[in-house]
From Swiss-Prot:
Sequence positions bearing N6-acetyllysine: 5, 60, 64, 71, 89, 126, 193, 199, 202, 228, 233, 256, 281, 285, 335, 343, 406, 420
Molecular function terms, GO-annotated: DNA-binding transcription repressor activity, RNA polymerase II-specific; enzyme binding; GTPase binding; heat shock protein binding; identical protein binding; magnesium ion binding; phosphopyruvate hydratase activity; protein homodimerization activity
This protein's name: Alpha-enolase
Sequence similarity: Belongs to the enolase family.
Gene for this chain: Eno1
UniProt-annotated stretches for the region Required for interaction with PLG: 405-434
């Protein structure tokens, strides 16, 4: 079934910034997709095209990306009469039309919007759920429900507090189903709110961009202490583990790291990569920390390699790998990390996202599917994580509707699968291992 019409528009993301939405029509109906946007972005990400017209939306408009879709991409795809199930062919055509390494002509936000809409249309064309269509595209015979990694304490570039490390997450690995994992996550979240309120007052329970709390604490260890206490209060000490996203590129300063980077600059407090690694190891020893994302700067390859070799936990590459097959191949060759963070808008098409995932998995890595801090009500990544069988997803706290939209969609998928539903649980790092 070919594409009859494509129409793009500017809509608003969860931070009140414009983003791209695409409507794609086939004889089967309308298929709509919206593109997310990150705050702490890796320098190697595909280009998100913004207007940079300071008189409009502080320069963050996306009318150029929208125009590229409406005036260039849409007519080309409609005239070619390509079948929407041919995801790779359509993505390839857009990439060739763009002609740049990082999608800077059309913008990754333009290409991705169309790519996501095509994928949704392809599923309906085949008469299967979206997660099944994605599983087919990836060559996966089965599907798996992921462990959710709830970002319940926000710091770094996502929050106005002093905390340097960006995300402190809870993973209910001891749950027996996704629905139970949601309940555990929600109960720990509410206990955490009470713990923070008692210790720091009601003001401290305001939430950050991803629905997590952002109490004004400086010590990263204090965030772990709060989590440990909330998990215990909720009665889930044996069932919940902790993950972190440090986003260390945000506080990398000339070969060292500044754990108080939101205060006036003072080089005397910078610490070395080895000192930072020792700090992480103390966290791993004292708390149930099983996963650390972006522990070092995106170009501090030596520090990554040393840490991954000795930490004994999941080390996730985000800014390091930016969902880019070339960066993933380099990181795999150097054993820099052992898990890929998969963000569709870092690479800018469904096909390349699937390739990045398969490449990571073929190197024995785990894969965690991720939202961005600027999100929409689009739920594509919920189906993506199930179809790709990655076993883990992070899409915020159990708070804020743009986050819950994804979690609720996974609940529906679990219900639809019925007795065939398989939850990753404690095997979240390698859920396909028999």
């Amino acid at each position: 079934m070919s594409i009859l019409k494509i129409h793009a528009r500017e809509i608003f993301d969860s931070r009140g910034n414009p983003t791209v939405e695409v409507d794609l029509y086939t004889a089967k109906g309308l298929f709509r997709a919206a593109v997310p946007s990150g705050a702490s972005t890796g320098i190697y990400e595909a280009l998100e095209l913004r207007d940079n017209d300071k008189t409009r939306f502080m320069g963050k408009g996306v009318s150029k990306a929208v125009e590229h879709i409406n005036k260039t991409i849409a007519p080309a795809l409609v005239s070619k009469k390509l079948n929407v199930v041919e995801q790779e062919k359509i993505d390839q055509l857009m990439i060739e039309m763009d002609g740049t390494e990082n999608k800077s002509k059309f913008g990754a936000n333009a290409i991705l919007g169309v790519s996501l809409a095509v994928c949704k249309a392809g599923a309906v064309e085949k008469g299967v759920p979206l997660y099944r269509h994605i599983a087919d595209l990836a060559g996966n015979p089965e599907v798996i429900l992921p462990v959710p990694a709830f970002n319940v304490i926000n710091g770094g570039s996502h929050a106005g507090n002093k905390l340097a490390m960006q995300e402190f997450m809870i993973l209910p690995v001891g749950a027996s189903s996704f629905r139970e994992a949601m309940r555990i996550g929600a109960e720990v979240y509410h206990n955490l709110k009470n713990v923070i309120k008692e210790k720091y007052g009601k003001d401290a329970t305001n939430v950050g961009d991803e629905g997590g709390f952002a109490p004004n604490i400086l010590e990263n260890k204090e965030a772990l202490e709060l989590l440990k206490s909330a998990i215990a209060k909720a009665g889930y000490t044996d069932q919940v583990v902790i993950g972190m996203d440090v986003a260390a590129s945000e506080f990398y300063r000339a070969g060292k790291y500044d754990l108080d980077f939101k205060s006036p600059d003072d080089a005397s407090r910078y610490i070395t990569p080895d000192q930072l690694a020792d700090l992480y190891k103390s966290f791993i020893k004292d708390y149930p920390v099983v996963s650390i994302e972006d522990p070092f700067d995106q170009d501090d390859w030596d520090a990554w390699q040393k840490f991954t070799a000795t930490a004994g936990i999941q080390v996730v590459g985000d800014d390091l790998t930016v969902t880019n097959p070339k960066r993933i191949a380099k990181a795999a060759g150097e054993k820099s990390c052992n898990c890929l963070l998969l963000k569709v808008n870092q690479i800018g098409s469904v096909t390349e996202s699937l390739q990045a995932c398969k490449l990571a998995q073929s190197n024995g890595w785990g894969v965690m599917v991720s939202h961005r801090s600027g999100e929409t009500e689009d739920t594509f990544i919920a189906d993506l994580v199930v179809g790709l069988c990655t076993g883990q997803i992070k899409t915020g706290a159990p708070c804020r509707s743009e986050r819950l939209a994804k979690y609720n969609q996974i609940l529906r998928i679990e219900e639809e699968l019925g007795s065939k539903a398989k939850f990753a649980g404690r095997s979240f790092r390698n859920p396909l291992a028999k």
